């Protein structure tokens, strides 16, 4: 029987009008909840029934790259994302929070200081720095060459950390992901 529910798979979960009720019901049944958002609905995040873990996906460190990569239909998408980062900061004492940086070789692996500024704004418990993977619909827009190697992800993570008080805590080479935290803690479980 499942114990953990990921609320993220297709589309943006914060657009689901009964998200709070879903999270409450899952918690009543003693399940953990894992919500992954693109940050375009900060008002929903602000009033969200607190999940067990809240992830915010970040694909760009600045407005120009955000507009190029995310191509949000919302004209104020960049502002919405930054507002959501501030909300993550306020939720840190209520739930596990994480930023997920997806690195795309040849596109957004630049401006490490600006990536660090996103960490500083949200101050999440975890930052996952991961490689773009050439799968699904993304294959229509990007190439196999846009997938950074694990060593490239790790090296770029180190560049980000020159501007941050976080540090590399863990990594998983096959998944091409590096975990950043301020400090590790007992009981942390590697889920990748």
Can you name each region flagged by the protein language model?
Residues 89-90, 94, 107-192:
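Auxiliary Fe-S-binding modules of radical SAM enzymes
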Residues 3-7, 33-35, 54-56, 95-101, ...:
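Hydrophobic faces of well-ordered beta-strands that scaffold small-molecule active sites
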Residues 30-32, 51, 94-96, 165-167:
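A generic structural signal for alpha->beta connector loops
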Residues 10-12, 38-40, 59-61, 102-104, ...:
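Active-site beta-loop-alpha junctions enriched in small/polar residues
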Residues 46-65, 124-133:
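Non-cysteine beta-strand/loop elements that form the S-adenosyl-L-methionine
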Residues 1-51, 86-89:
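Conserved Radical SAM active-site core
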Residues 30-34, 58-62, 78-83, 122-126, ...:
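Glycine-rich loops and low-complexity Gly/Arg-rich segments
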Residues 9-22, 61, 65-86, 105-114, ...:
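Conserved non-cysteine loop/helix-boundary elements of the Radical SAM core domain that shape
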